[in-house]
């Protein structure tokens, strides 16, 4: 049976063994302006977010940002998904919303790009990992909603949940 040892959703005060792994805002995810990383890792830098710079509107299947993680000792499974994601066509779809224009949003799913273990794009649930192994995931653009053609520059915010489990 898997035991959850680290959760990104909440830090439960006074509970040993539970550590907040991050609830992140992608604060400068601009379409036409260079962006800068704004992520504070909370578990010895085990997880980090790397945004992507845009010169134009994202195209379908474009990479919005990447997630790199090194699995801490004692961890045998990971769950990674956009917080508050919806299931569509068997995938968990998250949303990045323009802070200044909430009508504009980018839908995406998480895809595993490297590392051992099987993980299908947008998969629900946890998947097996090996401790001290590095993994790379990408947030892949699947479309969006906007009132006019193209996105405006601005801050696109969203949350990602990463949970680590041990046997």
UniProtKB/Swiss-Prot annotation:
Matches recorded under InterPro entries: CssA/B (IPR031788), Fimbrial_Assembly_Comp (IPR053732)
UniProt GO cellular component terms: pilus
Subcellular compartments: Fimbrium
Keyword terms, alphabetized: Fimbrium, Signal
Keyword check for Amino-acid biosynthesis: no
Chief subcellular location: other
Signal sequence coordinates: 1-21
Protein name, per record: CS6 fimbrial subunit B
Species for this entry: Escherichia coli
Gene this chain is encoded by: cssB
